[in-house]
A protein has these predicted regions:
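A short acidic, often aromatic-flanked loop/helix-cap motif at beta-alpha or helix-coil junctions
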Residues: 54-59, 127-129, 157-159, 242-244
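A secondary-structure boundary/capping signal
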Residues: 25, 92-93, 122-125, 190-191, ...
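Conserved core of the sugar-phosphate nucleotidyltransferase
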Residues: 99-188
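Conserved beta-strand scaffold positions in the cores of enzyme catalytic domains, especially
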Residues: 47-49, 119-121, 234-236, 243
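Conserved N-terminal catalytic core of the sugar/cofactor nucleotidyltransferase
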Residues: 4-92, 97-104, 111
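Conserved alpha/beta core of the MobA/IspD/sugar-nucleotide pyrophosphorylase nucleotidyltransferase superfamily
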Residues: 144-145, 151, 159-274
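Short, high-confidence coil segments that cap the C-terminus of an alpha-helix
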Residues: 18, 85, 116-117, 231-232
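Short, surface-exposed amphipathic charged segments that create phosphate/polyanion-binding patches used
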Residues: 58-70, 134-139, 250-254
């Protein structure tokens, strides 16, 4: 995608009050990344780079010779444990989340956290994450007393002929989702104690899956474990931001037009970083 969603996320994060950006990349990409990406942020924000590699495992574990796939999104978070010292948000670099999403999570992270396991996530309204060009997969959330109760990955969410949002459940029955149903788009808020929990859960993951070449340690699965054990609560934050990206090639013209509109109406300057 020629549109750099990452640049918009960095810009929006700065506007929301975040003061440092930590990028998780492959070591072999470092030189190009510093020249082509980090250079544009100089003078605008404090940036750091950490490296995710398949050999970055806890003491006592050795990466299998046939492993080529990264260990997953929650393993990527663990790469920042020696760099991050305060509350932090986690995003997908190639997603566009919108200004309001960063505003609400920055507000939540800036309050006092006086206990471990006090986390948050932005719950996007599923109707604001859809495409007209096919189906999508989303982590559909149930919320209890303002906190995350469950998150279930639903595949093939789409519009039906009446433009209702539907998916087929595990029993083969078509179910309808209300447009304001919260879904996770991997915009999470944590405090540094999450590294401790993640390290423990990653070791458990490796004990079961280290010899499975395509197994991955995902953020939602780790969070779900902590919620079910009572070690964490995850406040679900509402946003009216519209997530968008190029899920299908047919999405591209609409996304390009939307970015042009956001520049034209003054949401973003002509150049984000100059």
């Amino acid at each position: 995608m020629c549109i750099r969603d990452r640049d918009y996320s960095v810009y929006d994060a700065l506007q929301a009050g975040f003061g440092k950006i930590v990028f998780v990349i492959r070591k072999d990409f470092e030189d190009d990344f510093r020249k082509k990406v980090l250079s544009k942020y100089e003078g605008h924000v404090d940036v750091d780079v950490v490296f995710q590699s398949i050999d970055a495992l806890p003491e006592g574990y050795t990466c299998p010779a046939d492993r080529t796939k990264p260990w997953g999104t929650n393993h990527a978070i663990l790469m920042g444990k020696d760099t991050i010292t305060g509350p932090f948000a986690v995003i997908n670099a190639d997603d566009f989340y919108g200004r309001d999403a960063f505003r609400v999570i920055a507000g939540e992270l800036s309050r006092t956290h006086d206990r471990k396991g006090d986390y948050c996530m932005v719950g996007f309204r599923v109707g604001n994450t859809m495409t007209e060009n096919g189906s999508v997969s989303r982590g559909v959330c149930t919320v209890k007393d303002g906190n995350l109760d469950t998150v279930v990955e639903r595949t093939a969410i789409s519009f039906d002929k009446d433009h209702n949002i539907v998916f087929t459940d595990e029993n083969g029955t078509q179910q309808q989702l209300q447009p304001n149903t919260p879904v996770s788009m991997n915009l999470w808020g944590f405090t540094p104690d999450y590294f401790e929990y993640s390290g423990r859960e990653f070791r458990k993951f490796l004990d079961k899956n280290i010899d499975t070449p395509k197994s991955e340690f995902y953020i939602p699965s780790c969070v779900d474990t902590l919620v079910k054990s009572g070690e964490a609560t995850v406040k679900v934050l509402d946003t009216d931001s519209r997530w968008f990206g190029v899920t299908y090639a047919e999405d591209r013209p609409g996304v390009v037009a939307k970015f042009a509109e956001l520049h034209a109406n003054g949401t973003y300057p002509a150049k984000l970083f100059q």
